[in-house]
Structure formats: C-alpha cells, structure tokens
C-alpha cells in the first residue's frame, strides 16, 4: 500500500508531497518528494488568514487551497507513481488548544481533492487529538520512532515554522518517547526578513544575514523570558503566539541593524531548543535536524554552540530522507494508521487523555478497491518488534 502525504506548514511557503510505501518498514519506504511553492497571491492570502477573517473569505480560501492541493497531488502521482490514498494535513489557520474550548483548524477542501483525483483522502488529524484532550501537536513523533529509533537514545528536531523536538528511547528501553513544541523555528526569522526587506524577501537564505550580525545577549534573555518557554510539556504553539505581530513589536524598539536583529532571532530559536531539551528530556548524544531550518547554516551552528554535549546532524544527509519530505511522509504514515483502525497513544506527546484513531476518511472513487486491499494488509508496525505507541482497536 502506497500513501501520498500532503503537507503545508506554518511558514506557508508551499506544499510538500511525498510518497511512502508501507510494504517497506521505516525509512526504506520513502519513494520520493515533490515540492510546489504557493503562488505569491495565495501565500499572501494564507498569511492574512492568521488575522480576522470572515466566514465567506475563509470558505473561499478553503476551496482555493483544495484546488492547489489537488493539482499538487495529480502532479506528484505523475512524477512519483500511483498511490492508494492521500493523507492531507491541510493549512493551519488557527491553533489554540488551550482555549475554552480549545481548538485547532486546518483547511484545504479534502472533498475537492477526492473528487479531482478519485482517491480516498484521510484528513483532519489534529482535531481528533484535541477532542481527546491533547494539544493537537506535535503529531509527527510516532513516525520519528518508526523511522529513527536506534540502539541509543536520539533526539529528532523539526525546524519548520515552529520547532518541535522528539526524544526517542534506545531500543529495549521501556521509557516512552517524549515530544513537544519548543517554540519558534523559522517563523520569527522569516517574518523579520519580510519586514526588514519591505516584502522583497521571505527568508534568510543559508542564514547569511544572521551570520553578518551580532547577537544582542541582553535582548535575547528578555525574549527568552516569554511565558511559553517556561511552560512544561505537553505544549504546542503557533503563529498566534510567535508571528509577525510579535516581530513587529520587537523591531519597533530595536536600535541595532537588521543583521543584528536576525542574529538575535536566530539565537532565540537555537537557545530555546537547547534549554527545552535540557529541561524536559533525558538528552542524547546526537540530534537529527529536519525542516527548512536545517538548511540555515547560521542556525545549525547556533544549535551546535548551544548544545555542546550533543552532536547536531543534518537529518536529511544522515538518513537519506530529504528534510522537506519528512512531515509529508509522517502524515502518509498517520493516514495508513487511520485506515487500518490503529489507535495512537500520545499521552506523553500531546497530552491526549486516551488513545485515539487520528483522522477522518473521505472515500474516493477507489474506496471499494482500497477496502479490499486493507482487508489483506498485514499490520504495519515499527521494524520487527511491537510498536509501543500503537494499540489495535
């Protein structure tokens, strides 16, 4: 069984489409990735949706994103080969799991994708976790364990818009995995570049701007006093907490150069990760780094400087899975678990109060054939042993 994962994150830079072959365990199931950048007008609309947005505008954006995802899915199949289902993360518009009531919202018209492709779509993963009392994020850590668990404990860091870290116990270690959001990944740096360039640039390519500046350690400590960094896991965050309004406020009182501002924001991401790892995990000798932040040389160096006891490795080069593929692959795997009726126990990850089957299934034209295939599917577990985070229904 082959799944296509579609992922667009809080950076809102585009869609990653990756194929996972579930017949092969772990990283060996990776079959390729295709990335489609959002058109500038759509990206602007997505970013604007983080502010007040009317029902009609939200509904129209939902359909426009669905049309974009459908085009990406068709092109991914053309490039990477046929698949049996699509797993859609969608575009996060709001993430406030600690509200009254808490909620998270991802949009992207899954029905449009199913109709356009004829394929069954699994979607809406995060709201199931929130319904079970969880944060709705991070959801990728079980896939980290499926792919990257080793004899010794290991850390896996994803540097997308937000930064989230997973601590994996060594094989045979009875301790459960731990995972949580550390705070901002690329989101504040990207916002600062956009602000300082008057919209002419959207990211600090290779960390060159930050590398040309000096970190303001006084401001850094002020920013690290943010309440989120003091909060114990399980915890998750989003643009509502770390986004353009925060960067605009900090920039308005900044007296140094733009390069120094970028250098200090880069240090903020690195130091917040390092402090979170020391405070809330048992630590590990190595950490695999994925996501767009892994391509930022200034950020990778800042991480290594802040975590001298841990070897910081580029996850894509170390594992053979490109950084832009990891989250899309994870959702393809999560989609397979939903189709197979597998419960995920995420108590030590999101704080969910009991195991749940994550996701909703929207049958496509291939649904009857997929049902037959699912009835013949062996259980998909991690490597040779039982996967501790899975429980059969």
From Swiss-Prot:
GO MF term (any one): ATP binding
Protein name: Anhydro-N-acetylmuramic acid kinase
Record organism: Acidithiobacillus ferrooxidans (strain ATCC 23270 / DSM 14882 / CIP 104768 / NCIMB 8455) (Ferrobacillus ferrooxidans (strain ATCC 23270))
Protein task: Catalyzes the specific phosphorylation of 1,6-anhydro-N-acetylmuramic acid (anhMurNAc) with the simultaneous cleavage of the 1,6-anhydro ring, generating MurNAc-6-P. Is required for the utilization of anhMurNAc either imported from the medium or derived from its own cell wall murein, and thus plays a role in cell wall recycling.
UniProt-listed Gene3D superfamilies: 3.30.420.40
Lineage top rank: taxon: Bacteria
NCBIfam families named in the record: PRK09585.3-1
Pfam families (UniProt xref): AnmK
Gene Ontology terms describing biological process: 1,6-anhydro-N-acetyl-beta-muramic acid catabolic process; amino sugar metabolic process; peptidoglycan turnover
SUPFAM superfamilies (alphabetical): Actin-like ATPase domain
Catalytic activity: 1,6-anhydro-N-acetyl-beta-muramate + ATP + H2O = N-acetyl-D-muramate 6-phosphate + ADP + H(+)
């Amino acid at each position: 069984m082959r799944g296509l994962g579609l992922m667009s994150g809080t950076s809102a830079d585009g869609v990653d489409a990756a194929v996972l072959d579930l017949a092969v365990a772990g990283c060996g199931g990776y079959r390729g990735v295709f990335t489609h950048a959002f058109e500038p007008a759509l990206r602007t609309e997505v970013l604007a949706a983080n502010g007040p947005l009317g029902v009609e505008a939200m509904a129209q954006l939902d359909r426009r994103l669905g049309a974009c995802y459908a085009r990406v899915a068709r092109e991914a199949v053309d490039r990477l080969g046929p698949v049996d289902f699509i797993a859609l993360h969608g575009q996060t518009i709001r993430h406030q799991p600690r509200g009254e009531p808490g909620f998270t919202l991802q949009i992207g018209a899954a029905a449009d994708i199913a109709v356009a492709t004829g394929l069954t779509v699994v979607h809406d993963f995060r709201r199931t976790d929130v319904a079970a009392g969880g944060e709705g994020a991070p959801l990728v850590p079980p896939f980290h364990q499926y792919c990257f668990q080793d004899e010794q404990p290991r850390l896996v860091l994803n540097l997308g818009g937000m930064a989230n870290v997973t601590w994996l116990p060594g094989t045979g270690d009875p301790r459960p995995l731990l995972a949580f959001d550390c705070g901002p990944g690329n989101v504040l740096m990207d916002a600062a570049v956009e602000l300082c360039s008057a919209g002419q640039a959207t990211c600090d390519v290779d960390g060159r701007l930050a590398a040309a500046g000096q970190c303001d350690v006084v401001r850094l400590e002020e920013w690290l006093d943010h309440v989120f960094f003091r909060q114990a896991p399980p915890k998750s965050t989003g643009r509502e907490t770390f986004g353009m309004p925060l960067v605009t406020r900090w920039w308005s009182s900044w007296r140094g150069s733009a390069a120094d501002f970028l250098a200090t924001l880069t240090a903020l991401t690195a130091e917040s990760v390092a402090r979170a790892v020391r405070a809330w995990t048992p630590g590990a000798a190595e950490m695999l780094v994925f996501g767009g932040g892994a391509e930022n040389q200034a950020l990778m160096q800042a991480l290594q400087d802040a975590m001298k006891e841990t070897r910081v490795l580029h996850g894509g080069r170390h594992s053979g899975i490109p950084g832009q593929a990891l989250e899309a692959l994870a959702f393809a795997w999560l989609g397979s678990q939903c189709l197979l009726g597998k419960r995920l126990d995420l108590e030590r990850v999101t704080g969910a109060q009991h195991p749940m089957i994550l996701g909703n299934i929207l049958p496509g034209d291939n649904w009857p054939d997929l049902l037959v295939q699912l009835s013949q599917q062996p259980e998909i577990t991690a490597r040779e042993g039982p996967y501790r985070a899975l429980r059969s229904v």
